[in-house]
């Protein structure tokens, strides 16, 4: 795959991947700040107000870095920190009754899958059609049938 197709797919993937984080911050956590703080407090999150401010910053900054492809590895690390912490505080299915555990196990596995995507970005970078890509030397397209 070369140039336009790879670039379009990489950018589309970055946007789709970060949509959940941006919408969570902008449409839930910020407008419902005190309700989210109360929920975090109930779940035992230490210093919930400060934790929520840090969470919002991680979600927005990390997502923007990934979407525009500038410092995408750092952005992915920021979101990985958020995901790891949130997953173990809010989706601890092993501490729940069977009825609640099923839904939380699905949420846990969803987050685990997204963590895998963050690890891929940390390992491989943002890909084409990114600010990082436009500032690095170009390599000729590999047209071999195995790619």
Language model feature labels by segment:
Residues 1-32, 47-61, 67-147:
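Extended, low-polarity transmembrane helix blocks
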Residues 33-46:
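Short juxtamembrane and helix-loop transition motifs at transmembrane-helix boundaries
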